[in-house]
Amino acid sequence: LPAPSHADRTSSPRLVVVALASCGIAVSLMQTIVMPLLPEFPRLLNTTPTNAAWLVTANLIAGAVCAPVLGRLGDMFGKRRMLLVALAVMVAGSMLGAVSDDFLVVLVARALQGAAMGVVPLGISIMRDELPEEKVGSGIALMSSTLGAGGAIGLPLTGVVAENLSWHWLFGGAAVLGVVELVAIWRLVPESPVRTGGRFDLIGAVGLSAALVCLLLAVTQGNGWGWTSPAILGLFGGSMLVFLGWGVYELRLPRRAGGSTRQPLVDLRVSARPQVLLTNIASVLIGFAMFTSFMVSAQIFQAPTDSGYGFGMSLTRSGMALLPGGLMMIAFSPVTAGLSRRRGPRTTFLVGAAVLATANLVRTVAPHQLVVVVVTIAVTSIGAAFAYGAIPAMIMRAVPLSETAAANSLNALARSVGTSTCSAVVAAVTTASVVQVAGVTLPTAGAYAAVFAIGSLAAVCAFVVAALIPRDAGIDAGLPLSETGQDRIRIAP
Protein backbone atom coordinates (compact mmCIF):
# COMPACT_ATOMS: atom_id res chain seq x y z
CA LEU A 1 0.00 0.00 0.00
CA PRO A 2 1.36 3.44 -0.83
CA ALA A 3 2.23 5.58 2.17
CA PRO A 4 0.83 9.08 2.37
CA SER A 5 3.29 11.80 1.52
CA HIS A 6 3.75 15.31 2.79
CA ALA A 7 2.76 16.68 -0.57
CA ASP A 8 -0.43 14.63 -0.84
CA ARG A 9 -2.11 14.41 2.54
CA THR A 10 -5.53 12.81 2.77
CA SER A 11 -5.85 12.68 6.57
CA SER A 12 -7.51 15.41 8.55
CA PRO A 13 -5.53 16.88 11.47
CA ARG A 14 -8.02 15.24 13.82
CA LEU A 15 -7.28 11.77 12.45
CA VAL A 16 -3.55 12.41 12.69
CA VAL A 17 -3.95 13.44 16.35
CA VAL A 18 -6.09 10.39 17.15
CA ALA A 19 -3.66 8.01 15.45
CA LEU A 20 -0.65 9.47 17.21
CA ALA A 21 -2.31 9.99 20.59
CA SER A 22 -3.50 6.39 20.70
CA CYS A 23 0.17 5.41 20.65
CA GLY A 24 0.45 6.88 24.14
CA ILE A 25 -1.99 4.27 25.39
CA ALA A 26 0.12 1.53 23.79
CA VAL A 27 3.25 2.88 25.50
CA SER A 28 1.56 2.95 28.90
CA LEU A 29 0.24 -0.56 28.46
CA MET A 30 3.73 -1.87 27.66
CA GLN A 31 4.97 -0.44 30.96
CA THR A 32 2.09 -1.64 33.13
CA ILE A 33 0.75 -4.95 31.83
CA VAL A 34 3.12 -7.08 33.90
CA MET A 35 3.26 -5.04 37.12
CA PRO A 36 0.16 -6.48 38.84
CA LEU A 37 1.33 -10.01 37.99
CA LEU A 38 4.88 -9.69 39.32
CA PRO A 39 4.06 -11.69 42.49
CA GLU A 40 2.74 -14.52 40.27
CA PHE A 41 5.50 -14.66 37.65
CA PRO A 42 7.96 -16.67 39.81
CA ARG A 43 5.40 -19.50 39.77
CA LEU A 44 4.24 -18.96 36.20
CA LEU A 45 7.75 -18.84 34.73
CA ASN A 46 9.49 -21.16 37.20
CA THR A 47 11.92 -18.49 38.38
CA THR A 48 12.76 -16.45 41.48
CA PRO A 49 11.10 -13.21 42.62
CA THR A 50 14.40 -11.40 42.02
CA ASN A 51 14.52 -12.62 38.43
CA ALA A 52 10.85 -11.78 37.90
CA ALA A 53 11.54 -8.16 38.82
CA TRP A 54 13.79 -8.00 35.75
CA LEU A 55 10.66 -8.14 33.58
CA VAL A 56 10.14 -4.51 34.61
CA THR A 57 13.82 -3.54 34.72
CA ALA A 58 14.60 -4.88 31.23
CA ASN A 59 11.67 -2.98 29.74
CA LEU A 60 12.75 0.21 31.47
CA ILE A 61 16.40 0.00 30.41
CA ALA A 62 15.57 -0.93 26.82
CA GLY A 63 13.16 1.98 26.58
CA ALA A 64 15.67 4.41 28.03
CA VAL A 65 18.24 3.32 25.45
CA CYS A 66 15.82 3.31 22.51
CA ALA A 67 14.23 6.72 23.11
CA PRO A 68 17.23 8.99 22.38
CA VAL A 69 18.49 6.72 19.58
CA LEU A 70 15.13 6.64 17.79
CA GLY A 71 14.72 10.36 18.37
CA ARG A 72 17.97 11.23 16.64
CA LEU A 73 17.31 8.76 13.82
CA GLY A 74 13.88 10.34 13.41
CA ASP A 75 15.38 13.81 13.05
CA MET A 76 17.85 12.48 10.50
CA PHE A 77 15.86 10.01 8.40
CA GLY A 78 12.16 10.53 9.13
CA LYS A 79 10.12 10.58 12.33
CA ARG A 80 7.22 8.53 10.96
CA ARG A 81 9.65 5.92 9.65
CA MET A 82 11.29 5.50 13.06
CA LEU A 83 7.89 5.47 14.76
CA LEU A 84 6.88 2.53 12.57
CA VAL A 85 10.16 0.78 13.41
CA ALA A 86 9.52 1.23 17.14
CA LEU A 87 5.99 -0.15 16.84
CA ALA A 88 7.21 -3.11 14.78
CA VAL A 89 9.80 -4.00 17.43
CA MET A 90 7.13 -3.69 20.12
CA VAL A 91 4.83 -6.03 18.18
CA ALA A 92 7.64 -8.56 17.75
CA GLY A 93 8.28 -8.55 21.49
CA SER A 94 4.59 -8.92 22.29
CA MET A 95 4.22 -11.87 19.92
CA LEU A 96 7.28 -13.52 21.46
CA GLY A 97 5.86 -13.19 24.97
CA ALA A 98 2.48 -14.51 23.85
CA VAL A 99 3.84 -17.89 22.76
CA SER A 100 6.50 -18.72 25.37
CA ASP A 101 6.62 -19.91 28.98
CA ASP A 102 10.41 -19.64 29.22
CA PHE A 103 11.62 -16.87 31.51
CA LEU A 104 14.55 -15.80 29.32
CA VAL A 105 12.35 -15.60 26.24
CA VAL A 106 9.76 -13.51 28.09
CA LEU A 107 12.58 -11.30 29.39
CA VAL A 108 13.72 -10.66 25.81
CA ALA A 109 10.10 -9.98 24.88
CA ARG A 110 9.83 -7.35 27.60
CA ALA A 111 13.04 -5.70 26.41
CA LEU A 112 11.69 -5.54 22.85
CA GLN A 113 8.47 -4.01 24.15
CA GLY A 114 10.61 -1.26 25.66
CA ALA A 115 11.10 0.17 22.17
CA ALA A 116 7.63 1.66 22.61
CA MET A 117 9.14 4.40 24.79
CA GLY A 118 10.45 6.05 21.63
CA VAL A 119 6.97 6.32 20.11
CA VAL A 120 5.59 9.26 22.10
CA PRO A 121 8.43 11.79 21.57
CA LEU A 122 8.46 10.92 17.88
CA GLY A 123 4.69 11.39 17.68
CA ILE A 124 4.85 14.74 19.47
CA SER A 125 7.53 15.91 17.06
CA ILE A 126 5.40 14.85 14.08
CA MET A 127 2.56 16.92 15.50
CA ARG A 128 4.77 19.99 15.57
CA ASP A 129 5.84 19.44 11.97
CA GLU A 130 2.48 18.46 10.47
CA LEU A 131 -0.45 20.01 12.33
CA PRO A 132 -1.84 23.51 11.86
CA GLU A 133 -0.57 25.86 14.55
CA GLU A 134 -3.94 26.04 16.30
CA LYS A 135 -4.03 22.22 16.65
CA VAL A 136 -0.51 21.60 17.94
CA GLY A 137 -1.07 22.49 21.59
CA SER A 138 -4.25 20.45 22.02
CA GLY A 139 -2.73 17.50 20.15
CA ILE A 140 0.36 17.43 22.35
CA ALA A 141 -1.74 17.77 25.50
CA LEU A 142 -3.96 14.86 24.45
CA MET A 143 -0.99 12.65 23.58
CA SER A 144 0.70 13.42 26.88
CA SER A 145 -2.50 12.66 28.80
CA THR A 146 -2.87 9.24 27.21
CA LEU A 147 0.33 8.17 28.98
CA GLY A 148 -1.49 8.27 32.31
CA ALA A 149 -4.78 7.08 30.87
CA GLY A 150 -3.12 4.02 29.37
CA GLY A 151 -1.74 3.05 32.76
CA ALA A 152 -5.14 3.49 34.38
CA ILE A 153 -6.74 1.35 31.68
CA GLY A 154 -3.97 -1.23 31.80
CA LEU A 155 -4.33 -2.06 35.49
CA PRO A 156 -8.02 -3.11 35.45
CA LEU A 157 -7.48 -4.81 32.10
CA THR A 158 -4.59 -6.78 33.57
CA GLY A 159 -6.77 -7.69 36.52
CA VAL A 160 -9.58 -9.01 34.34
CA VAL A 161 -7.19 -11.05 32.21
CA ALA A 162 -5.23 -12.37 35.19
CA GLU A 163 -8.36 -13.50 37.00
CA ASN A 164 -10.13 -15.06 34.00
CA LEU A 165 -7.62 -15.91 31.25
CA SER A 166 -4.04 -16.95 30.70
CA TRP A 167 -1.38 -14.27 31.20
CA HIS A 168 -0.31 -14.91 27.59
CA TRP A 169 -3.36 -12.95 26.50
CA LEU A 170 -1.72 -9.81 27.89
CA PHE A 171 1.11 -10.13 25.38
CA GLY A 172 -1.20 -11.29 22.60
CA GLY A 173 -3.49 -8.33 23.13
CA ALA A 174 -0.50 -6.00 23.11
CA ALA A 175 0.57 -7.49 19.76
CA VAL A 176 -2.89 -6.91 18.27
CA LEU A 177 -2.93 -3.34 19.58
CA GLY A 178 0.51 -2.75 18.09
CA VAL A 179 -0.59 -4.01 14.67
CA VAL A 180 -3.63 -1.71 14.76
CA GLU A 181 -1.33 1.20 15.63
CA LEU A 182 1.02 0.28 12.79
CA VAL A 183 -1.78 0.31 10.24
CA ALA A 184 -3.19 3.58 11.60
CA ILE A 185 0.17 5.35 11.47
CA TRP A 186 0.93 3.93 8.01
CA ARG A 187 -2.37 5.05 6.53
CA LEU A 188 -3.18 8.26 8.39
CA VAL A 189 0.08 9.98 9.31
CA PRO A 190 2.27 11.61 6.64
CA GLU A 191 6.03 11.65 6.91
CA SER A 192 7.53 14.86 8.25
CA PRO A 193 9.66 16.74 5.73
CA VAL A 194 11.96 18.15 8.43
CA ARG A 195 15.34 16.37 8.29
CA THR A 196 18.88 17.09 9.43
CA GLY A 197 20.66 14.53 7.24
CA GLY A 198 24.22 13.54 8.13
CA ARG A 199 25.62 10.32 9.57
CA PHE A 200 24.39 8.61 12.71
CA ASP A 201 26.57 8.94 15.82
CA LEU A 202 27.08 5.26 16.62
CA ILE A 203 29.84 5.89 19.17
CA GLY A 204 27.64 8.40 20.98
CA ALA A 205 24.73 5.95 20.99
CA VAL A 206 26.87 3.18 22.48
CA GLY A 207 28.31 5.55 25.09
CA LEU A 208 24.94 6.91 26.19
CA SER A 209 23.46 3.40 26.26
CA ALA A 210 26.28 2.14 28.49
CA ALA A 211 25.90 5.08 30.87
CA LEU A 212 22.12 4.65 31.07
CA VAL A 213 22.35 0.92 31.67
CA CYS A 214 24.75 1.48 34.58
CA LEU A 215 22.63 4.27 36.06
CA LEU A 216 19.26 2.54 35.78
CA LEU A 217 20.64 -0.78 36.99
CA ALA A 218 21.93 0.98 40.10
CA VAL A 219 18.63 2.80 40.67
CA THR A 220 16.37 -0.20 40.13
CA GLN A 221 18.51 -2.80 41.92
CA GLY A 222 19.83 -0.70 44.79
CA ASN A 223 17.16 -1.79 47.23
CA GLY A 224 17.76 -5.48 46.53
CA TRP A 225 21.55 -5.47 46.26
CA GLY A 226 22.14 -2.87 48.96
CA TRP A 227 22.75 0.81 48.27
CA THR A 228 26.27 0.67 49.71
CA SER A 229 27.22 -2.63 48.07
CA PRO A 230 30.29 -2.62 45.80
CA ALA A 231 28.13 -3.49 42.79
CA ILE A 232 25.77 -0.53 43.22
CA LEU A 233 28.55 1.93 44.04
CA GLY A 234 30.51 0.64 41.05
CA LEU A 235 27.51 1.09 38.77
CA PHE A 236 26.94 4.66 39.96
CA GLY A 237 30.63 5.47 39.59
CA GLY A 238 30.81 3.81 36.19
CA SER A 239 27.78 5.71 34.93
CA MET A 240 29.32 9.02 36.01
CA LEU A 241 32.61 8.26 34.25
CA VAL A 242 30.92 7.10 31.07
CA PHE A 243 28.59 10.11 31.06
CA LEU A 244 31.62 12.39 31.43
CA GLY A 245 33.51 10.75 28.58
CA TRP A 246 30.40 10.67 26.43
CA GLY A 247 29.77 14.37 27.02
CA VAL A 248 33.32 15.32 26.03
CA TYR A 249 33.00 13.26 22.85
CA GLU A 250 29.61 14.74 21.91
CA LEU A 251 30.86 18.30 22.36
CA ARG A 252 33.71 17.65 19.94
CA LEU A 253 31.41 16.63 17.10
CA PRO A 254 30.56 19.34 14.55
CA ARG A 255 26.98 20.61 14.44
CA ARG A 256 26.77 21.09 10.67
CA ALA A 257 23.87 19.22 9.09
CA GLY A 258 23.81 17.23 5.90
CA GLY A 259 26.39 15.46 3.80
CA SER A 260 28.63 12.92 5.47
CA THR A 261 28.99 14.88 8.72
CA ARG A 262 28.35 12.79 11.82
CA GLN A 263 25.58 14.41 13.87
CA PRO A 264 25.89 14.28 17.68
CA LEU A 265 23.33 11.94 19.21
CA VAL A 266 22.39 14.72 21.64
CA ASP A 267 23.31 18.32 20.91
CA LEU A 268 24.60 19.18 24.38
CA ARG A 269 24.93 22.85 23.51
CA VAL A 270 21.20 22.99 22.87
CA SER A 271 20.46 20.75 25.87
CA ALA A 272 22.51 23.04 28.13
CA ARG A 273 20.36 26.07 27.35
CA PRO A 274 18.61 27.11 30.59
CA GLN A 275 15.15 26.64 29.06
CA VAL A 276 15.96 23.05 28.05
CA LEU A 277 18.16 22.03 30.99
CA LEU A 278 15.82 23.33 33.68
CA THR A 279 12.78 21.86 31.92
CA ASN A 280 14.45 18.44 31.89
CA ILE A 281 15.36 18.72 35.58
CA ALA A 282 11.79 19.72 36.39
CA SER A 283 10.61 16.74 34.32
CA VAL A 284 12.64 14.33 36.46
CA LEU A 285 11.04 15.77 39.59
CA ILE A 286 7.49 15.86 38.20
CA GLY A 287 7.86 12.27 36.97
CA PHE A 288 8.80 11.30 40.53
CA ALA A 289 5.89 13.24 42.06
CA MET A 290 3.31 11.78 39.67
CA PHE A 291 4.54 8.19 40.02
CA THR A 292 4.22 8.09 43.82
CA SER A 293 0.44 7.82 43.56
CA PHE A 294 0.61 5.33 40.71
CA MET A 295 3.10 3.12 42.58
CA VAL A 296 1.32 2.76 45.91
CA SER A 297 -2.39 3.38 45.30
CA ALA A 298 -3.02 -0.11 43.91
CA GLN A 299 -1.14 -1.61 46.88
CA ILE A 300 -3.30 0.38 49.30
CA PHE A 301 -6.52 -0.68 47.57
CA GLN A 302 -5.49 -4.36 47.73
CA ALA A 303 -4.13 -4.32 51.29
CA PRO A 304 -6.38 -6.06 53.87
CA THR A 305 -8.67 -3.87 55.94
CA ASP A 306 -6.93 -5.12 59.10
CA SER A 307 -3.88 -3.09 58.08
CA GLY A 308 -5.69 0.09 59.09
CA TYR A 309 -5.35 1.69 55.68
CA GLY A 310 -6.23 -0.97 53.10
CA PHE A 311 -9.56 -1.72 51.42
CA GLY A 312 -9.20 -5.45 50.66
CA MET A 313 -9.98 -5.08 46.95
CA SER A 314 -9.32 -7.61 44.23
CA LEU A 315 -6.91 -6.87 41.41
CA THR A 316 -9.77 -5.93 39.08
CA ARG A 317 -11.61 -3.73 41.59
CA SER A 318 -8.43 -1.88 42.53
CA GLY A 319 -7.81 -1.21 38.87
CA MET A 320 -11.34 0.13 38.46
CA ALA A 321 -10.76 2.46 41.41
CA LEU A 322 -7.74 3.88 39.56
CA LEU A 323 -9.60 4.31 36.28
CA PRO A 324 -11.20 7.72 37.08
CA GLY A 325 -7.74 9.19 37.51
CA GLY A 326 -6.69 8.14 34.02
CA LEU A 327 -9.90 9.46 32.52
CA MET A 328 -9.31 12.81 34.23
CA MET A 329 -6.02 13.15 32.37
CA ILE A 330 -7.81 12.86 29.03
CA ALA A 331 -10.72 15.06 30.10
CA PHE A 332 -8.43 17.89 31.17
CA SER A 333 -6.14 17.82 28.12
CA PRO A 334 -8.17 20.55 26.32
CA VAL A 335 -8.02 22.68 29.48
CA THR A 336 -4.24 22.37 29.67
CA ALA A 337 -3.90 23.22 25.98
CA GLY A 338 -6.12 26.29 26.40
CA LEU A 339 -4.15 27.55 29.39
CA SER A 340 -0.86 27.08 27.53
CA ARG A 341 -2.29 28.94 24.56
CA ARG A 342 -3.36 31.90 26.70
CA ARG A 343 -0.65 32.09 29.34
CA GLY A 344 2.21 29.97 28.02
CA PRO A 345 3.22 26.38 28.86
CA ARG A 346 5.35 27.33 31.87
CA THR A 347 2.27 28.68 33.66
CA THR A 348 0.49 25.42 32.86
CA PHE A 349 3.41 23.43 34.25
CA LEU A 350 3.49 25.52 37.44
CA VAL A 351 -0.24 24.90 37.96
CA GLY A 352 0.30 21.17 37.48
CA ALA A 353 3.23 21.06 39.92
CA ALA A 354 1.21 22.97 42.53
CA VAL A 355 -1.75 20.61 42.16
CA LEU A 356 0.53 17.56 42.44
CA ALA A 357 2.20 18.95 45.55
CA THR A 358 -1.17 19.62 47.17
CA ALA A 359 -2.64 16.23 46.25
CA ASN A 360 0.36 14.34 47.62
CA LEU A 361 0.27 16.43 50.78
CA VAL A 362 -3.41 15.60 51.27
CA ARG A 363 -2.61 11.90 50.84
CA THR A 364 -0.01 12.31 53.59
CA VAL A 365 -2.43 13.58 56.25
CA ALA A 366 -5.95 12.65 55.05
CA PRO A 367 -7.96 9.85 56.69
CA HIS A 368 -7.94 6.46 54.97
CA GLN A 369 -11.42 6.67 53.46
CA LEU A 370 -12.19 5.32 50.01
CA VAL A 371 -13.81 8.48 48.68
CA VAL A 372 -10.86 10.59 49.84
CA VAL A 373 -8.34 8.28 48.20
CA VAL A 374 -10.23 8.07 44.88
CA VAL A 375 -10.75 11.85 44.73
CA THR A 376 -7.10 12.63 45.52
CA ILE A 377 -5.98 10.15 42.87
CA ALA A 378 -8.16 12.00 40.36
CA VAL A 379 -6.73 15.35 41.49
CA THR A 380 -3.21 13.94 41.15
CA SER A 381 -4.04 12.92 37.59
CA ILE A 382 -5.33 16.42 36.84
CA GLY A 383 -2.05 17.88 38.07
CA ALA A 384 -0.13 15.39 35.96
CA ALA A 385 -2.25 16.36 32.93
CA PHE A 386 -1.29 20.02 33.34
CA ALA A 387 2.41 19.30 33.88
CA TYR A 388 2.82 16.56 31.27
CA GLY A 389 0.80 18.52 28.71
CA ALA A 390 3.07 21.55 29.11
CA ILE A 391 6.48 19.87 29.08
CA PRO A 392 6.74 19.05 25.33
CA ALA A 393 5.70 22.59 24.42
CA MET A 394 8.33 24.01 26.79
CA ILE A 395 10.97 21.86 25.12
CA MET A 396 9.93 22.49 21.53
CA ARG A 397 9.73 26.26 22.00
CA ALA A 398 13.40 26.24 23.04
CA VAL A 399 14.98 24.04 20.34
CA PRO A 400 15.34 24.21 16.54
CA LEU A 401 12.79 22.38 14.41
CA SER A 402 15.52 19.97 13.31
CA GLU A 403 16.13 18.93 16.95
CA THR A 404 12.56 18.29 18.10
CA ALA A 405 12.55 14.48 18.08
CA ALA A 406 15.95 14.21 19.79
CA ALA A 407 15.02 16.89 22.35
CA ASN A 408 11.64 15.28 23.11
CA SER A 409 13.28 11.87 23.42
CA LEU A 410 15.83 13.23 25.89
CA ASN A 411 12.98 14.74 27.88
CA ALA A 412 11.11 11.42 27.84
CA LEU A 413 14.29 9.87 29.20
CA ALA A 414 14.37 12.49 31.98
CA ARG A 415 10.82 11.61 33.01
CA SER A 416 11.75 7.93 32.92
CA VAL A 417 14.66 8.57 35.28
CA GLY A 418 12.20 10.31 37.60
CA THR A 419 9.74 7.42 37.62
CA SER A 420 12.55 4.87 38.03
CA THR A 421 13.98 6.78 40.97
CA CYS A 422 10.50 6.99 42.47
CA SER A 423 10.12 3.22 42.18
CA ALA A 424 13.41 2.69 44.02
CA VAL A 425 12.57 5.21 46.75
CA VAL A 426 9.10 3.74 47.27
CA ALA A 427 10.60 0.25 47.59
CA ALA A 428 13.20 1.46 50.09
CA VAL A 429 10.71 3.38 52.25
CA THR A 430 7.96 0.76 52.26
CA THR A 431 10.35 -2.06 53.18
CA ALA A 432 12.03 -0.05 55.93
CA SER A 433 8.85 0.20 58.02
CA VAL A 434 6.65 -2.91 58.04
CA VAL A 435 4.04 -4.60 60.17
CA GLN A 436 2.69 -8.16 60.38
CA VAL A 437 -1.01 -8.48 59.49
CA ALA A 438 -2.48 -11.99 59.61
CA GLY A 439 0.98 -13.44 59.03
CA VAL A 440 1.67 -11.20 56.03
CA THR A 441 4.34 -8.50 56.04
CA LEU A 442 2.94 -5.16 54.90
CA PRO A 443 4.22 -1.58 54.86
CA THR A 444 2.97 0.58 57.72
CA ALA A 445 0.62 3.50 57.23
CA GLY A 446 3.51 5.74 58.23
CA ALA A 447 5.62 4.36 55.39
CA TYR A 448 2.98 5.29 52.83
CA ALA A 449 2.59 8.73 54.43
CA ALA A 450 6.35 9.22 54.05
CA VAL A 451 6.14 8.24 50.37
CA PHE A 452 3.46 10.86 49.70
CA ALA A 453 5.39 13.48 51.67
CA ILE A 454 8.45 12.83 49.50
CA GLY A 455 6.26 13.05 46.39
CA SER A 456 4.88 16.39 47.56
CA LEU A 457 8.41 17.67 48.15
CA ALA A 458 9.44 16.56 44.65
CA ALA A 459 6.52 18.50 43.15
CA VAL A 460 7.48 21.60 45.14
CA CYS A 461 11.06 21.29 43.85
CA ALA A 462 9.72 20.92 40.29
CA PHE A 463 7.72 24.12 40.79
CA VAL A 464 10.81 25.99 42.00
CA VAL A 465 12.99 24.72 39.14
CA ALA A 466 10.37 25.68 36.53
CA ALA A 467 10.03 29.11 38.09
CA LEU A 468 13.79 29.60 37.61
CA ILE A 469 13.57 29.12 33.83
CA PRO A 470 14.50 32.46 32.23
CA ARG A 471 11.47 34.40 31.10
CA ASP A 472 11.05 33.92 27.39
CA ALA A 473 8.21 34.62 24.97
CA GLY A 474 8.14 30.99 23.95
CA ILE A 475 7.27 29.66 27.38
CA ASP A 476 5.54 32.63 28.98
CA ALA A 477 3.14 33.59 26.19
CA GLY A 478 0.74 31.71 23.99
CA LEU A 479 2.65 32.15 20.76
CA PRO A 480 2.63 29.64 17.91
CA LEU A 481 5.54 27.26 17.92
CA SER A 482 6.74 28.58 14.58
CA GLU A 483 7.29 32.00 16.15
CA THR A 484 9.34 30.75 19.07
CA GLY A 485 11.59 27.94 17.88
CA GLN A 486 14.77 28.65 15.94
CA ASP A 487 14.41 27.26 12.44
CA ARG A 488 17.31 25.13 11.31
CA ILE A 489 15.39 22.87 8.96
CA ARG A 490 15.94 21.08 5.72
CA ILE A 491 12.92 19.91 3.74
CA ALA A 492 13.37 16.38 2.53
CA PRO A 493 12.82 15.96 -1.20
Residue spans for each PLM region:
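Helix-loop-helix hairpin linking two adjacent transmembrane segments in secondary transporters
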Residues: 150-183, 200-238
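Conserved MFS/SLC helix-loop-helix module at the cytosolic interface between two early adjacent transmembrane helices
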Residues: 65-101
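Cytoplasmic helix-loop-helix junction between adjacent transmembrane helices
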Residues: 112-145
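Membrane-interface helix termini in secondary transporters
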Residues: 40, 68-72, 76, 160, ...
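12-transmembrane solute porter fold
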Residues: 14-30, 34-38, 47-49, 53-58, ...
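C-terminal membrane-cytosol helix-exit motif in multi-pass small-molecule transporters
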Residues: 175-193, 209-221, 239-256, 462-470
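Paired small-residue
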Residues: 89-96, 104-112, 371-379
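Helix-breaking motifs and short loop linkers at transmembrane-helix boundaries and internal kinks
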Residues: 44-46, 78, 99-104, 165-166, ...
